[in-house]
């Protein structure tokens, strides 16, 4: 345990262990600590006579401490000391051995002896409460510190009287010894509480200090609320020069100055006159302004002028400069001007109006009287009854407003000010029979022990319904009891439960009652039991006490003249007319925060910019969170412009500065006060405007929703210089600027926003939007983020069509205003699957499996036509307009496509509108897309996007994926491979060196190529245009959009089938040409296989073996295997080198290509790794009659259909081979060892078709590397398909002929077989006729010998 021993004002905490120690030991330890506290050495003499308990009991020196004292008790030491230090309160003892000079030492004479003489029994005085009430010649000082130099007894007994320190009596009131001013004038005033007394205090005379060491109504030591100090307040005297003012320092600092209270006492009874006005429904004919004192306090309404011929002038009801301080039972003092107007309008609904008026002659006296009440006003303005009516406005006195007529139905609040006005009206409306007493200053010296709070607060009655998650809050208590009882406080609000759902209970609230049971004296465990006793689904009633902070708002660009009484020379527009004449109103809301952290204020804001000059128009409310403080308050609306927040103006600032001001003010002031004060500008419709000043609302005018008493309206004349706040009601431009209808001028509310500004669009209510648009519709700022229904181009074109009265905003459409399945309202699971009603629409979801791309699309505004707007068609985001919304990922963009398609906005057939390309696309992907969309023909544009029957989930993947290993879907795998390779090859410029006929052919091929665009491109193709010629399509865009809507789904299916048949017919024709070439190539391949290095060339074509080496030489098997291993390391076939040919060759042929095909096939048969075989094929096509096969393999054609066509083509193979063989030129063989491939290309230019294929990078993937190695990117899907078909054909021939006849063993066949098995084997030389073409039977026998019996089928 530990106790606190008080030596005068110095408190020493002494640890006592378990308390089993004597009081004598405690005194010794306390003295030692006291010496250290006052910085004295151990020889400093201190004598402690006794220790007294707080309740007055004296502790015996032999008592055990734990028996006579409790833990944390405070004990008072009655002591003497050698040389009292001059340290004041004893808490600062840094000046060791030094003393401050005595200012008044000379005036005190030579009596420098200490007031604390050695202890004498006769000098001991027992001070008790009864003794304090007696007339003892004791003088009370500010402190009982022994540092005060004692005064002689003659001084105490002499005729000195004390006065309260004030500006009239600047008595020094501190711990330093001072002098007393002799009382020569005035007599002390007394109150009925205590008598006129003088006291003298010694350190031993402290038995009456028991209260100061307890947490009760006088917990602070001898503070201003202490009863002994209260004597100073009760002995107030008026000095002879009481009217003079002195601005010197008044002590004690912070004490209420009483010097101003002794001016001549003007009572409100002498000033106020009562004016009774019968209400006949007509206007009063007065113009009023707020009447403010010099300190800014509102003292009422000042009658500025009277209308000529009005009721007030005719009946002589008021005079100019009269001050109205009360209307009926509503006090107008210390009220905001908006509240005063509200009370004025309420009074205009009563049959008789009682005005309490201070005449103009007494106005100065009334203002002086208000100054004497100022301090008391600030101490009581935050009473529980006036928490929302106090002076919290942005400008308490100077807001000059043209106001609207009454809107409220409910009667005004019954609120008492700090001083009651006379003539307090009775419910009947008549004045009382006797006036109330004049205001007096009452100084309370005690505070209720039940509250004991630093700030004055309010009581709240809260009912919570206990559910399955409990009440949802926790409680705590103080560790030190107050007067024997521990207060119970709400510790925190749990994230689930009744408290957070209700939203009114706050952390820090003090519980007063639970279900009517007073909690005073109850422990925390008892309160918990009481709360837990509430049954399930039962209601618990809580009475809580909440402390309130004073809120002094900042000025809102208010001029000093506005804070004072308006002068007669002011302009007429500064007068306040109580009738509206504008088109918008300014409202003030004080929104209480939840303080539970559920949603903060709960609003999302946006910044608007002007379309003409890009000027910032202000901050507007974008949306309101359902469940937030603003939603529960219910008064803030979407598109309200924020004028000021917590007294800080947002006008005249850029949107960025205003947003920063908004964040800072809401995060500091809002959290500090628990309430956010908002001033907003809201448009009013003309039908709600009233006519006459001060007149009650007529029956023909509907009464709108009642405003809360915390609501106010302020002047638009104060903000007349702001852009968009024009007073002309005929200008729709001002309305559009102030309301911001387009909904797209948004700064991102989710970037660096505090928790109070978290953006969660969860409001189920329809936004209240103006019915008219303007021709000044603004464009979106670049910070626009999110999926917004409104479109900037829509507003712009609608304004062109009808600038005065345009069609309704898309936001007004209730169908578009709220969509449960709309974008931004779906969870992650709903975005993927839930919103699609049938399986066919899931194709858009499957596109999310494609690789992500950064598709940044720049803004484009003109998307819809004027005709569409006039026709009343809803403005929706279709086609490229979806891309205008900046999307954080491809997935969110595809979700937008899926949603619009689900709603029927994207028909199956759509011309491709052009959009300028943004940043970040992959170059190869962009090039492929650009080629697909590059200048489509107008006639054939309808054939842009096709869907084939083979579309599956796999077909929607990106074309850059590797070849599939699924053996049951070779055609699909090849198809994806071809899509990827041919899209990569689309970078070339096909316009180079082409005739008009070739260009037309290329366009036809590009159209065919579009038919194979699948998967992701199928969805994105309806949205984006990645091409370059953006402006070319603007003329055709309107017609195309109309055409696309005229097609039905049935016509689309028919057209798709016809197009597919046409594509298949073209593919069949092309493959027939390929088959003829292959048959001839096989015959030549037979010749090349049996040829040798030393044989003569025929037709200028050297053998394949001769192209690989300078002179054929036998190679050992070891060398052959080493070479094979070397090629295998780079995953390249050994025999894939291109054959350098003679420099005298006149025309290249396709023999070499067929030969390499054959050798690579044999090499693949010997390879055991299936995966390696799939990646080791790349072929050249240097034959002159090669056609750019851009169509082959682009669509899924089954192998069975291809084999059927192949069998038909075999019958013509012999004739075709014979014709081509006979047409070859004859030329003698030359050594080709020294001729490189580059020299061959330079000396002999190939034919035109081959030259174009060679120069075009589109076909670069068809050709291998010039050094004979395969390029890693050189896979060609078309050649792979040809190889697959060839191998399948040969496999079938082998199986058929093996059944008919056994294989023959010829030396040439054997040599060929050995050559395939061992590449180093050189066949024996022998005569062979090269001028006779081989028969097809030889090719068949060659296939049987060269193909192993257990060869594996080749799959790509």
UniProtKB/Swiss-Prot annotation:
Please give the residue ranges the record annotates as the region Interaction with FRMD4A.
935-1356
Question: What spans are recorded as compositionally biased (Low complexity)?
Answer: 91-100, 1196-1205
Q: Which residues carry this modification: Phosphoserine?
A: 25, 156, 174, 383, 692, 695, 715, 728, 809, 827, 837, 852, 873, 962, 971, 973, 1046
Provide an example Pfam family for this protein.
Par3_HAL_N_term
Q: Which InterPro entries match?
A: PAR3, Par3/HAL_N, PDZ, PDZ_sf
Q: Which residues carry this modification: N6-acetyllysine?
A: 834, 851, 885, 1350
Cite the record's Acidic residues compositional bias ranges: 939-953
Sorted alphabetically, the Gene Ontology BP terms of this entry are: asymmetric cell division; axonogenesis; bicellular tight junction assembly; cell adhesion; establishment of cell polarity; establishment of centrosome localization; establishment of epithelial cell polarity; establishment or maintenance of cell polarity
Renumbered to this chain, the Polar residues biased-composition regions fall at 154-163, 171-187, 204-224, 968-982, 1136-1149, 1221-1245, 1337-1346
Give the coiled coil ranges: 1049-1077, 1151-1174, 1201-1224, 1280-1301
State the PROSITE patterns in the record: PDZ
The similarity annotation says: Belongs to the PAR3 family.
Subunit (UniProt): Interacts (via PDZ 1 domain) with F11R/JAM1, PARD6A and PARD6B. Interacts with PRCKI and CDH5. Interacts (via PDZ 3 domain) with PTEN (via C-terminus). Part of a complex with PARD6A or PARD6B, PRKCI or PRKCZ and CDC42 or RAC1. Component of a complex whose core is composed of ARHGAP17, AMOT, PALS1, PATJ and PARD3/PAR3. Interacts with LIMK2, AURKA and AURKB. Component of the Par polarity complex, composed of at least phosphorylated PRKCZ, PARD3 and TIAM1. Directly interacts with TIAM1 and TIAM2. Interacts with ECT2, FBF1 and SIRT2. Interacts (via coiled-coil domain) with FRMD4A.
Kindly identify the disorder that the protein's record connects it with: Neural tube defects: Congenital malformations of the central nervous system and adjacent structures related to defective neural tube closure during the first trimester of pregnancy. Failure of neural tube closure can occur at any level of the embryonic axis. Common NTD forms include anencephaly, myelomeningocele and spina bifida, which result from the failure of fusion in the cranial and spinal region of the neural tube. NTDs have a multifactorial etiology encompassing both genetic and environmental components.
Protein's name in the database: Partitioning defective 3 homolog
